[in-house]
Amino acid sequence: MKTKGVRMYGKNDLRVEEFELPEIKDDEILVENISDSVCMSTYKAAILGKEHKRVPKDVDINPIIIGHEFSGNIVKVGSKWKEQFKEGEKFAIQPALNYKGTMWSPGYSYMYCGGDATYNIIPNEVMELGCLLNYKGEAYYEASLAEPMSCIIGAFHACYH
């Protein structure tokens, strides 16, 4: 399926492109992005390119979709996740995975998973870690602001007051 998105190829090298998404695997989920917040972390990744700790070293060959604060609709569910997720449901994502000790994260590290695309593929590890969240609210932007709000709350609790 065709999608349009903002992909990073390196330092200060962002491109709006139309490209083909592969068919999802049994352990993946296809989603339609509706809202993606803009974050200074994304700006930092765009400036640093592969020097950013979450951006793959081969980003010039295998570009990633940027945007990690996103929400939208589930379009297609791989067989592994059909009991937990349904087509048409709304979702929000928690991008801080720390999967098996890696720094990989949606919006920084994956060729087919990021918020700045019309459609993307959520990889298995996101669901394995419970980071694809069902969203019951009305406004998609509220769901895409969940991650930055959690940063604010975490910073508040980390401060002496």
Language-model features and meaning:
Residues 1-4:
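Extreme N-terminal starter segment of soluble prokaryotic enzymes
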Residues 7-14:
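Extracellular beta-rich ligand/substrate-recognition surface
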Residues 22-36, 51-100, 114, 133:
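Glycine-rich beta-strand-centered segment in the early N-terminal region that forms part
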Residues 44-52:
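Short Gly/aromatic-enriched secondary-structure transition segments
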Residues 97-161:
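NAD(P)H dinucleotide-binding glycine-rich loop of Rossmann-like/cofactor-binding domains
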